[in-house]
């Protein structure tokens, strides 16, 4: 079985860079990132590995909703200037890059999904909870900084909903970290209660006459935001990827 280690590049590198005493020390960063990747390769023993990077193009999510990820700190200049050098260094050490046009998330989701379609296994190295919507048993999520798997069961317990309801939950409650609006006035607690009764976002709106009047009013007024939030949260898993597995094989 092909076992593909897919590293969310900026999710890993920005955390490592932020912990450095000197943010301009790109040589030190290269060594630290490579050390982290060696540790990942040694632990997971994949047949293939790649690090996926965000691109500079405006994402379709940002084009759809201007406030998406608004307020996030920009990438430090020293890190931005050192990325090309970092990627080349990692390639020299048997870890090739995939450069997304905009957000890496959809490329990672597509690659992981394609792996499962050929009976492969994908291990996504990222702390981004959005990947928990990829619930195929052959897709796993690894938190490098806490050295443990981010399991579907843990996320279900944390949010209070089933894995099949993750997107519906965020469409209702929103996601402050990514500035996903959700339905104004419907917080996490209300979202959980509604999904326990009606099971899905579609069922909630199809049964709006069975919802209490106050909540029904909020839901009706926030219907467009719910639809928008659902789109923003949902990962694309069918992007065209011009890559060949052979490019990313790890020589044992």
Swiss-Prot record:
InterPro entries: 5-3_exonucl_a-hlix_arch_N, 5-3_exonuclease, 5-3_exonuclease_C_sf, DNA_polI_H3TH, FEN, HhH2, PIN-like_dom_sf, Xni
HAMAP family per record: Xni
Record keywords: DNA-binding, Endonuclease, Hydrolase, Magnesium, Metal-binding, Nuclease, Potassium
Presence of the UniProt keyword Metal-binding in the record: yes
Protein name: Flap endonuclease Xni
UniProt-listed Gene3D superfamilies: 5' to 3' exonuclease, C-terminal subdomain (1.10.150.20), 5'-nuclease (3.40.50.1010)
Function: Has flap endonuclease activity. During DNA replication, flap endonucleases cleave the 5'-overhanging flap structure that is generated by displacement synthesis when DNA polymerase encounters the 5'-end of a downstream Okazaki fragment.
Pfam families named among the record's database cross-references: 5_3_exonuc, 5_3_exonuc_N
Binding residues annotated for Mg(2+), in chain numbering: 105
Family: Belongs to the Xni family.
GO molecular function: 5'-3' exonuclease activity; 5'-flap endonuclease activity; DNA binding; magnesium ion binding; potassium ion binding
Annotated source species: Shewanella halifaxensis (strain HAW-EB4)
Binding site for K(+): 172-173, 181, 183, 186
Region (Interaction with DNA): 185-190
CDD domains cross-referenced by the UniProt entry: H3TH_53EXO, PIN_53EXO
UniProt enzyme class: hydrolase
GO-annotated biological processes: DNA replication, Okazaki fragment processing
5'-3' exonuclease domain ranges (all copies): 161-251
Origin: domain of life: Bacteria
Cofactor(s) required, per the database record: Mg(2+); K(+)
Cofactor note: Binds 2 Mg(2+) per subunit. Only one magnesium ion has a direct interaction with the protein, the other interactions are indirect. Binds 1 K(+) per subunit. The potassium ion strongly increases the affinity for DNA.
Record EC number: 3.1.-.-
């Amino acid at each position: 079985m092909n076992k593909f280690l897919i590293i969310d590049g900026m999710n890993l590198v920005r955390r490592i860079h932020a912990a450095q005493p000197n943010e301009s020390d790109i040589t030190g960063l290269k060594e630290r990132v490579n050390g982290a990747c060696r540790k990942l390769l040694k632990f997971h023993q994949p047949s293939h590995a790649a690090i996926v990077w965000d691109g500079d193009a405006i994402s379709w999510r940002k084009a759809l909703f201007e406030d998406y990820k608004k307020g996030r700190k920009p990438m430090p200049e020293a890190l931005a200037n050192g990325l090309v050098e970092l990627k080349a260094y990692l390639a020299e050490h048997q870890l090739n890059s995939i450069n997304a046009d905009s957000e890496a998330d959809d490329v990672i989701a597509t690659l992981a999904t394609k792996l499962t379609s050929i009976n492969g296994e994908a291990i996504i190295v990222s702390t981004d909870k959005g990947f928990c919507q990829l619930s195929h048993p052959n897709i796993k999520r690894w938190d490098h900084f806490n050295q443990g798997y981010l399991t579907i069961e843990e996320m279900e317990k944390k949010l209070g909903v089933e894995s099949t309801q993750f997107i519906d939950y965020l469409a209702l409650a929103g996601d402050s970290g990514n500035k996903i609006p959700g339905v104004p006035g419907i917080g996490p607690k209300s979202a959980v209660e509604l999904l326990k009764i009606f099971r899905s976002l579609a069922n909630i709106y199809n049964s709006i006459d069975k919802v209490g009047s106050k909540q029904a009013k909020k839901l009706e007024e926030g219907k467009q935001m719910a639809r928008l939030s659902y789109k923003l949260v949902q990962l694309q898993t069918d992007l065209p990827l011009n890559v060949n597995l052979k490019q990313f094989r790890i020589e044992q």
